[in-house]
Amino acid sequence: MGDRLAVSIIGVLSFAIVFVVGALLLGHEPGRPWSAEVAALPALNAALNATSAALLGVGWAAVRRRRIALHRACMLGACGVSTLFLVSYVTYHYLAGSRPFTGTGWLRWVYFPILVSHIVLAAAMVPFVLTTLYRALTGDFVRHVRIARFTLPVWLYVSVTGVVVYLLLYRLR
């Protein structure tokens, strides 16, 4: 596959992912009653985000030590876990909708900036993750490293703040 086709596919896929998630968050009314399984999904999502963050950290440490096979395994694992997260996240919001934040006082001043930065960066990073992955899989390591220097810290931030948002929304209310 040529770079032009890959860029087109990455663009369409990124748009589709962001569009579906945005439509669910902004315009979808859940149509099914809650169940124990649905209620468990936010905790699962936080666990998937934490796993992704751990894999990203280990993968970064591995590449710094020139342990390329471990780096590759961790980064592919982070992609897989993030994909599972996306499926679980979309499923939860399709079935349950969004949960309003009920915290007050200083907690609101902490929660909303974290939430906004998490949402904006999560949406913006989709094409960067896909491009970084594509460049690694095609052996274009010079350009892979160049974009990964940006992608990794943003992806790590999004993964960690996903856990923080969960804790603030479901545990520290």
Language-model segment annotations:
Residues M1-R173:
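Alpha-helical membrane insertion/targeting regions
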